[in-house]
Amino acid sequence: MRIAYIINSVEGGGAALPVPSVVDVLRRGGADVKVFALTRRDGRALPAFDAANLDVSIRQGGEKDHIAALRWLDTALSEWRPTHLWTSLTRATLLGQLVSLRRHVPVVSWQHAAFLKPANRLLLRSTQSLSRLWIGDSETVTRLTAERLAVGPDRLVQWPIFRADPSAPRCEPWRPGEILRIGSLGRLHPVKGYDVLVDALGRLGHTNVPYELLIGGDGAQKEALSAQAQAAGITSLRLAGYVGDPGAFLAGLHAYVQPSRSEGLCVAAHEAMQAGLPVIASAVGELPHSIVDGTTGWTVPPGDARALASVLARLVGNPGDLAAMGGRARERLLDRFSAARFENIGLSILDRMRRF
């Protein structure tokens, strides 16, 4: 079995994050896998790909030149001669489906995002029958794939893209006299809701325990967020830029916040739980299923700065409770997203693909 894993880009974050773990399982099941990226973007996923010894082919092109991308993909796949295509996200899926029609190769398609642009939703709904199997990366995305794309249960499976690592770095408990460190990881984009977080910080006001809030990530909103914080007189916020070692970043925190307007599974928040951090998150995607409200963290309505400020005040006001709460979050995550469970689901999908 030769699987061509087609992705939009090798950008750090997003759908590229789980590729090494997924390929590892497919290889363990006896498949030969090669990754085909339609464009490079920032290339920050490549160190992880290299560490996993992935075979990667990257097209030198942009994000809108779809005809050129289709020609490149068709040529590349005709040369590599896969037995199956595995696609991720809308562009890779649509182009992969077109190549599959020409090359008569079955397609398996991931869905990672809870939000789809209306045009993408219409396109995928019209072509969904071209993929033999659809995979949702979380409970929410799997349900939405069935509803929005009209994919029947016989062609839809759920494979959470997070594989827990018990050896990942863990955070240290907060101690009296320390600055309380709260953090977040994500691109500086409206969907991540960092403007809502800044609004919440402005509402928080004075706290008895000093704190700082670090956001690790780059993006087009950097200047706007800085200006918003400055206008609100917020001095506790630091935009730390891209974080190459998220495990070390998370291990240096006492709590984590994910104020997103939309998510699928949200790998970063689950990495935070893995590090033993309590998580405050918007109730979107998989997050309300992973967080036990008031026990392992808190959930708030997306876009609600007032509710977020209220929970932040509770967190900052009781820092001595955070370590125990984060410990419960970690235990629950290691059980729900164990490596054995991750591998078993992947191997069952691979067995199903052999029967196509």
Predicted regions and their residues:
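A conserved mid-protein helix/loop that constitutes part of the nucleotide-sugar donor-binding site
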Residues: 13-21, 184-203, 220-226, 270, ...
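Short hydrophobic beta-strand element within catalytic cores of glycosyltransferases
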Residues: 37, 278-281, 291
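Short His-centered aromatic/hydrophobic patch
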Residues: 87-93
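A conserved, positively charged/aromatic
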Residues: 107-136, 150
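Donor nucleotide-sugar binding/catalytic pocket of nucleotide-sugar-dependent glycosyltransferases
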Residues: 130-168
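Aromatic "clamp/platform" in nucleotide-sugar-dependent glycosyltransferases that forms part
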Residues: 242, 261
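Conserved acidic donor-binding segment of nucleotide-sugar-dependent glycosyltransferases
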Residues: 293-294, 298-305, 314-319
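A short, well-ordered alpha-helix in the C-terminal region of glycosyltransferases
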Residues: 307, 314, 321-336, 342-345
